[in-house]
């Protein structure tokens, strides 16, 4: 009886120990899930780009640097890599290009590794953009991609980059540059805050809602202004004037009104038009051949506008890498393809 009782007691003890172990392990896993940082998505793999070096005529001073800002959206990274390659390839002084990348928190280490392995000689820095700055201010627009926090990062650019930078070129990720970016960098701003290709005689009724046009106070904002549209995906910004004029706060004010009254549909663009329309330094249209991604609903193919081209921009729903992968490219997408550094599984097998 004693031996049976002992065995029974040992069995109960063993079961209790196992139950405690399982419970403790489960709790540890649960706590771990709660405390763990958001994991970065699996990033595409890219081929290493060639090294691009300065010509003999290039300066080496800080004043010779050309500052370029872009966002690092993991969904658009393939486009960003192509854009960077195009900038380097067509630059007379590629080592003078200084890149300022804005990314969401938690992803910067993976993105840094991806850029460094693709462009080992690139002069760049990654800055964290806090999505909470805009998340509560974003209103739903006509396309989900326009509602992402990084789409609004350009508004806070002057507050994020170093104070020593007094001019910067902001570029979207769905474009390629086929000219020397130094030409755009040296544009004479003539006292303006923003320089960009400008399209006047625009029909502003398409950009704002009936609520806007029926409000006599809001409509006054556009009184006396030339009805000129510009695409915010390609801008030269006088950062000092932006800071002094407190333009970040001015854009935020319009976003707050939008949240209350729903006065426009197109994401981050309309606030820029309300503030800067007709009051920017106009740049030659060759620096933004935009709309190559088609409209915001179907992304149908479009042809090039007549005239010289320095920059091709796939604004709109259709992106060249997606259309090429689906084997349903538009003709203009083949102009983007030579800059694609994406290493597909097929290419990996061939190597």
UniProtKB/Swiss-Prot annotation:
Its main location: Golgi. GO terms for molecular function: polygalacturonate 4-alpha-galacturonosyltransferase activity. Keywords: Cell wall biogenesis/degradation, Glycoprotein, Glycosyltransferase, Golgi apparatus, Membrane, Signal-anchor, Transferase, Transmembrane, Transmembrane helix. Pfam families: Glyco_transf_8. It is found in: Golgi apparatus membrane. Its EC number is 2.4.1.-. Residues 30-351 are lumenal. It is an enzyme of class 2 (transferase). GO terms for biological process: cell wall organization; pectin biosynthetic process. It is a single-pass type II membrane protein. Pathway: Glycan metabolism; pectin biosynthesis. Gene3D superfamilies: Spore Coat Polysaccharide Biosynthesis Protein SpsA, Chain A. The keyword tRNA processing does not apply. This is Probable galacturonosyltransferase-like 4. PANTHER family: GALACTURONOSYLTRANSFERASE-LIKE 4-RELATED, GLYCOSYLTRANSFERASE 8 DOMAIN-CONTAINING PROTEIN. Glycans are attached at residues 96, 203. Residues 1-8 are cytoplasmic. Belongs to the glycosyltransferase 8 family. May be involved in pectin and/or xylans biosynthesis in cell walls. InterPro entries: Glyco_trans_8 (IPR002495), Glycosyltrans_8_dom-fam (IPR050748), Nucleotide-diphossugar_trans (IPR029044). One of its GO terms (cellular component) is pollen tube. The gene is GATL4. The keyword Glycoprotein applies. It comes from Arabidopsis thaliana (Mouse-ear cress). The chain crosses the membrane at residues 9-29.
